[in-house]
Amino acid sequence: MWKQYIKQALYQLKENRLISIVCMVGTALAICMIMVIVLTLQIRIKDCVPEVNRSRSLYVKAMTSRHKEQHNNAASSQMSVTTARECFKTLTIPEAVTITSVNNKMRASLPGGGRMSVDEMETDEAFWQVFCFEFLCGKPYTKADFESGLSKAVVSASVARRLFGTTDVVGRTIQLNKADYTITGVVKDVSKLATASYAQVWIPYTSTDLASFSWRENLMGPMRAVILARSSAD
């Protein structure tokens, strides 16, 4: 009986070749799109480098400020540096808490040399504890660098190769919006699907005036927080 069904199916395919081709191509494309969507969701949800701790991380991307008496007077946005520090950096139960800026476009260049536009993120030193980057050379900027507001930078491999022609650039100087930064490390390129950690250049937010950029009585600003729990059960 199965042989008869197969023969009938083959006969119908031969009789209506155009319709058969359209149906097969449509089915293949539908399956392909479903696979792409599933893979994209998996990449954004599952633990993967550098966001290997997603299963025990809490992402605080925005906040809402509401007036105590005027209930219609409310606003939602990212938080200021002051708000992030007072609300989250004082926590003692988590393994680590990092405060980061949203991505910004910045001009990266060499004195008298090449230049390019890069995606830049400003972070604290705990960022390198929460996220696990693959360093090709060097290391991240330290807590001392951060607290001193030193102009240190970690760059991606593609930026290093584009500007210097090599990834062995630790100790060399790069200009970010015409300000000199010393490169402390080079990391493997990060996928844009790693939305919490993606950038091409990372610098301490204390090396800029980002802390002064706030509004709504210093509650809101350009910062986000990631809280790393000690276990996924926390």
What does each of the following model-derived ranges do?
Residues W2-K14, T83-C87:
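A short amphipathic helical element positioned immediately N-terminal to and/or at the very start
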Residues L13-N16, C23, R44, L58-A62, ...:
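Generic structural signal for small/hydrophobic residues in well-ordered secondary structure
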Residues E15-R44:
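Short, strongly hydrophobic transmembrane alpha-helices
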Residues R56-L58, V118, K139, R172:
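Extracytoplasmic/periplasmic beta-strand context in beta-sandwich domains
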Residues Q70-V81, G114-D119, E147-S151, V190-W202, ...:
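Solvent-exposed, non-transmembrane alpha-helical starts
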Residues L91, T100-V102, S109-P140, F146-E147, ...:
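The feature marks short, hydrophobic/small-residue-biased sequence motifs that occur predominantly
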Residues D124-Y141, S151-D234:
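Mid-to-C-terminal secondary-structure elements
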